[in-house]
């Protein structure tokens, strides 16, 4: 025995006897597992004495070390750090250098192996490879801890030679699979895949019987299947299916085939805040928004509308699944160490390559500074090793925002179209495995992003220098479209690096057109001044946006069907004609006429290519947020106030009984409700509500009392729903769903941007509350949403007005030029805005007092 071994033996003995003390002094709660009779057998050192006396604090499980993991959602018992493992690790290197061959295994003869253990061990060996100097793993690690009283003479090194312990922490950090967890997963997968066809068919029928809003009830939904499998399922043009995005939790991917090429479109899930305590889910697809995925599919299949402008792909033939979702997940997304060829395997090892359906692992919760601390996956120390931290980070997917795609379109930063080649970078292991894993088309994908703990995304400058970067996946191979938002690969990689395409290549030519629209005007003007006309404009020169200085409303040259060339303000015959036209149709028809005129004025509809070139943007909703869109903002302010005044004149001009005025009030309330709910026109909804809330109308007590008596439902609708909703809109707390909006509520934003030109109409919502700064910030934040979804408003307006046959007379009544001529005459319509509004406020006050004179205090 060497001198070092003697010192180690003395330290070991001192720890055994001095650290634990006398066994008789132990409390009864720490009594030995065996009776005191077993202590008399100290001289017997047979290797098959498994029932040895062991201390409760260092006891390890009997069978293979099946430590529970938080990702498996099993019990967390037994995951505490073992103090004996640290000691065993220090002497393991010395033992391997001294001994050339392994000692006999200390396996108790009376404990049988659990079923399927050999198969699980074979899978583990295939995944990790054999170790040359380490003996085979024994299924009984409990022989490591031997009672210190029974073997005081045996050196520590000899005991550890006979039963080499496993360093649980090191092999978990290195990404090696555990035998126990593989055994559990193998059994679970085998149980699912070995189900009888009758059982699978019955389970599929139960899924298809669910509610139609439940995605599982539709056969074209295939769950978590790999990208390659989905491409093989769509065989003909028009075939399509919906699957889960394997990297963006909660998102979906529409896979279809068009022009003999498989295309993938990502469906983003966003949370829309509709109030302080109410939120709902929206699914954004291209420039459209839907309440649920089945509505998206019904819309595109029923209308045969192309899913994207770039590809022109049309879907009409669903590819139905023939197995339940549980079976598909077991086939492609559950097995870690399974020997089935379809089981996905991570390139960086089986550990951490799969994610449970409703949970995320600790890697997804890392912040950027934690991820960039280390270079390699196995040797990373940025992650805390105790499993308690993993338990705390295994949160529900519904409780955290998506880390891979923005949850709101407001936070999206558009990718530069000038970079069309996307290089996907995956973290690779620091050392190659002893046994090479077979390449599989499914092994590249997995249900969890392939960023192992501590892998660091390299910067653009050093990304290509590393020896372990994986092959690049260009965007052009995934789809022919240059649109990054529509054709980004939803299933591979954690981060991407944009590489500029080579000038003259096909990718460069395809992206030049879209890049001109995305770049700022300053960059394009600078390029024009330095290099002349850009080559990517296909022979066209850059057109500077036109800064409009004159209003689009010109009452003097307005050609009318109802108004003569020269008219006076508030002509009685003209007012009677307008009242008759408004009474002939119902509130919904009026709302459609109003919405059509609004969308034409705001340039949501009827925008030609020439108009887009002159504006510099595609839609008016984006123009009104820009500096050169000032005239559009002023025109919308003019239209808002003119519309409110005309409706107020229509009510106050009713000189009949209070019942007639109450009926007219009721129809006006119905018009506001139709504009809000059916048409999604928040602009005219606010204008109609502004007319009802005018002081000259709200003071008509007899009219409102009659309304509550004769039209109770209208009065309740106005007081309980419409007024609170408008208040929430003005305070920036609530808004309609994007899928139902044709004209957003932009009046507060316009008032903020044009505060010097906006006519005073009472206190602003941000000036009469203590939360004024929050209200202003909410409206400025909403401006980003308005500018971003201009195409969505255009699509919604087209859908709601599809097949609508408008009457020219009603369209003229709701046009701004007609209203200006009606209210101020042919000459007064050209006067200044402030003067017109000031005079007409006095006219409305006079009409109101004529209907219901003010009660004098002496008459009370």
From Swiss-Prot:
One of its GO terms (molecular function) is guanyl-nucleotide exchange factor activity. Residues 586-854 form the Ras-GEF domain. It is found in: Cytoplasm; Cell membrane; Cell projection, Axon; Cell projection, Ruffle membrane. CDD domains: SH2_BCAR3 (cd10337). Coiled coil: none annotated. One of its GO terms (cellular component) is cytosol. The modification Phosphotyrosine is found at residues 278, 283, 793. Residues 220-319 form the SH2 domain. Residues 162-175 have a biased composition (Basic and acidic residues). It is a peripheral membrane protein. The C-terminal Cdc25-homology/Ras-GEF domain adopts a closed conformation rendering it incapable of carrying out canonical exchange factor function, this closed conformation is required for interaction with BCAR1. This is SH2 domain-containing protein 3C. It comes from Homo sapiens (Human).
